[in-house]
């Protein structure tokens, strides 16, 4: 995690660094710092908490100068304190480093450096980078960084500034993102384009193992042997307005309401329902190749994985192919049975989640074909996959993923139909029927959102509870999992999800009047079974909040609270049913006074193991 910004130019570096760090706060927000070359010395400012605290400190204690580096932290090694905040210095205090990622061999290096006389001031792994560069620095910062790179193990990106080498900053990318922005007499470095988009749209994406030197007039990228490389400059065509709140109290609420529009973007141009045709050339997989796969493995983390669980149901239903879905962090270490007859689908909003990236690489190493379902364009995973399905959900800022989830599920619907068609399991008419309904889903969700005020009353009634159980079956079991994840991550209420039929095998022991049960009980093949499960809860004095299909009056007999959703087919119901659960979590968290967009201990992009 963590966010990095670097600036070399003619404007006040502190202003640019602070503005950039605010845009990167989604990557971590437990402490932050900047270092600016002020005359011939380095002005270092570090504060615990969000960027606004650092901003106050810089206002009180200005750091004037036109060259600097900055960092927003999500703690891995060492608590979130001012002395653990970046930038970190070497012994001389003349060299500063910011870093995103983990240095796996930092203890070994720290011992070696301590023995040779270096003294450390923090509990971080980052500080070894500063001391290692110091130990190799014989007057050429670039060379010292290259030698240091050769000693570090792990996945990371870092940027270095040395007051004795006052016209440049140097960076290296080794697994975590680092991009450079080209300006006129000023140049930028950052973890993400959003940090520097107000200044430039011309971006260079670094590859792993590349070392970068940034001066006011030029950006030079080197390979690990310090041979200069020719790098392509990409022009960014989206803007930051898409990443602002547009009058909503929180990004999460805005993003929930954006779902009709994002789904329209995800689906747009990808099918013709009247002809029952899909246009998915971007998968980079011919119909013949797709038809030959014997199994599919879906790997992802968190919400992205839950979309994958829905994908498993859909792929098995429509394409009749065996599918497993697993946590990327488990998959990468469990010796999975995959080979060149396996299609591995990796799902990620950010496209840079460390476990998902590593799982994808492992799958490729074993000969599988990889397909990414990704939101962030040109992200690490997107660039390495054999084929990419971009979900086009736009920037998602709220740490709790909402619009990316429904867009990922929509991607799975299209991919499952496509596979069903090329494998001869679905006729053109069948595909056309599902697509015709899919086309209506954005307006179905709009209608659902217009009538969603009642969810605030439900939230009010349950905001003080300490535990929740979520139940669902079939394709809506993942909906229950996603609902529970949303609630726990932003409201800090303990919430767990179970397949409704599994409840009687253990969790039923938890049921009493203090633990509300949220049941997804929309019309489906297992509707009657879910009703029985709800009755089992009621028989034990449980309180039940039911997500039910509009017009289902029967449910009033069983439910304490009902949230109605429009009727849609079972296969597409996860797209609709999750929306009230997102809203329920949002309103409960808001009523509890939680930081909805930046919940404690989390970060939007998890680039560490
Ligand atoms: C979502 O609400 C979570 N914050 C988290 O589970 C997230 O979905 C997960 O970390 C995966 O992120 P990715 O989609 O960017 O790979």
Question: Positions of the model-derived regions?
Answer:
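Conserved short alpha-helical segments that host acidic/polar catalytic motifs at enzyme active sites
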Residues: 1-250, 254, 258-297, 306, ...
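Glycine-rich, anion-gripping cofactor-binding loops and their flanking helix/strand elements
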Residues: 179-201, 329-363, 504-538, 568-582, ...
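Glycine-rich phosphate-binding loops that contact phosphosugars or nucleotide phosphates
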Residues: 291-432, 437-440, 522-559, 584
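Short acidic loop-to-helix transition motifs that present clustered carboxylates
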Residues: 128, 154, 196, 325-334, ...
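Acidic/histidine-rich
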Residues: 155-186, 458, 463-489, 531
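Active-site phosphate/pyrophosphate-binding segments
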Residues: 259-263, 267-297, 387-516, 589-609
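Glycine-rich oxoanion-binding loops at beta->alpha junctions
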Residues: 66, 70-83, 274-287, 311-347, ...
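Generic C-terminus detector
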Residues: 226, 252, 543, 556-558, ...
């Amino acid at each position: 995690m963590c966010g990095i910004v670097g600036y070399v130019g003619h404007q006040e570096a502190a202003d640019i660094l602070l503005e950039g760090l605010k845009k990167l706060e989604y990557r971590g927000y437990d402490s932050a710092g900047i270092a600016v070359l002020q005359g011939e010395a380095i002005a270092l400012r570090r504060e615990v908490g969000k960027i606004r605290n650092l901003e106050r400190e810089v206002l009180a204690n200005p750091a004037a100068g036109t060259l600097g580096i900055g960092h927003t932290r999500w703690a891995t090694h060492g608590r979130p304190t001012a002395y653990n905040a970046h930038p970190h210095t070497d012994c001389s205090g003349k060299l500063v480093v910011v870093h995103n990622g983990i240095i796996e061999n930092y203890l070994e290096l720290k011992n070696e450096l301590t023995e040779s006389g270096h003294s450390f001031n923090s509990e971080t792994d980052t500080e070894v980078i500063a001391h290692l560069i110091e130990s190799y620095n014989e007057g050429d910062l670039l060379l010292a960084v290259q030698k240091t790179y050769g000693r570090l193990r792990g996945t990371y990106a870092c940027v270095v500034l040395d007051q004795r080498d006052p016209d440049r900053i140097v960076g290296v990318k080794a697994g975590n993102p680092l991009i450079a922005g080209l300006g006129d007499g000023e140049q930028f470095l950052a973890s993400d384009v959003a940090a520097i988009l107000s200044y430039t749209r011309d971006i260079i994406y670094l590859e792993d193992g590349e070392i970068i030197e940034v001066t006011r007039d030029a950006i030079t990228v080197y390979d690990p042997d310090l041979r200069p490389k020719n790098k392509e400059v990409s022009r960014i065509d989206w803007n930051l307005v898409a990443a602002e709140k547009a009058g909503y109290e929180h990004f999460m609420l805005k993003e929930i309401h954006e779902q009709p529009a994002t789904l329209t973007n995800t689906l747009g141009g990808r099918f013709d329902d009247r002809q029952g045709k899909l246009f998915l050339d971007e998968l980079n997989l011919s119909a013949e190749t797709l038809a030959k796969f014997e199994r599919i493995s879906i790997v992802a983390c968190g919400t992205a994985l839950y979309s994958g669980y829905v994908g498993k149901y859909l792929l098995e239903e429509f394409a009749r192919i065996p599918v497993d879905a697993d946590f990327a962090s488990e998959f990468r270490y469990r010796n999975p049975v995959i080979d060149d007859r396996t299609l591995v689908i990796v799902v990620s909003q950010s496209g840079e989640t460390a476990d998902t990236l590593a799982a994808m690489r492992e799958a490729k190493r074993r000969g599988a074909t990889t397909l990414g379902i990704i939101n962030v364009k040109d992200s690490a995973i997107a660039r390495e996959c054999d084929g990419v399905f971009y979900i086009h959900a736009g920037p998602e800022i709220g740490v709790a993923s909402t619009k990316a989830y429904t867009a990922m599920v929509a991607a799975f619907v299209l991919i499952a139909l496509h596979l069903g068609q090329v494998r001869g399991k679905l006729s053109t008419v069948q595909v056309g029927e599902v697509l015709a309904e899919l086309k209506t889903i954005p307006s179905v969700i709009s209608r659902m959102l217009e009538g969603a005020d009642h969810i605030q009353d439900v939230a009010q009634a349950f905001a003080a509870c300490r535990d929740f159980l979520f139940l669902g079956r079939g394709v809506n079991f993942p909906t229950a999992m996603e609902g529970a994840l949303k609630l726990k991550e932003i409201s800090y209420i303990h919430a767990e999800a179970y397949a409704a039929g599994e409840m009687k095998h253990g969790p039923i022991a938890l049921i009493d009047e203090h633990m509300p049960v949220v049941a997804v009980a929309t019309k489906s093949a297992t509707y009657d079974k879910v009703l029985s499960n709800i009755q089992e809860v009621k028989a034990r004095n449980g309180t039940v909040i039911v997500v039910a299909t509009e017009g289902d009056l029967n449910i009033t007999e069983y439910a304490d609270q009902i949230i109605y959703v429009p009727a849609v087919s079972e296969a597409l119901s996860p797209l609709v049913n999750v929306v009230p659960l997102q809203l329920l979590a949002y309103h409960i968290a808001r009523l509890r006074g939680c930081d909805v967009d930046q919940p404690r201990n989390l970060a939007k992009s998890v680039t560490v193991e």
